[in-house]
Amino acid sequence: MGDDLDHVRERLEGIAEELADLAIDRLRAAVDGNEGAAAEERRITRARRAVEKASNLLGSGSPDD
């Protein structure tokens, strides 16, 4: 795989980690009584999964995996 794709994959992995941290923060807020935080956490988690999927696709070398 080209260095450019490796770089993009690494950036996506970093973004996924940031999203995971944000999701944890929203869960903590939900426990503290923030009514909208649980819905935000679910949305952030869906986005994190999509970013992880994109990163995995770039790392696999095959779009059919």
Regions from the PLM with identified roles:
Residues 8, 63-65:
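Acidic, Ser/Thr- and Gly-enriched intrinsically disordered low-complexity segments
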Residues 3, 17, 39-40, 64:
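Intrinsic disorder/low-complexity signal
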Residues 31-63:
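Short, charge-rich amphipathic interface segments used for partner binding and complex assembly
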Residues 18-37:
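Short E/K-rich amphipathic alpha-helical oligomerization segments
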Residues 13, 23, 28, 58-59:
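Compositionally biased amphipathic helical and low-complexity segments enriched in hydrophobic
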Residues 1-22:
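N-terminal acidic leader/helix
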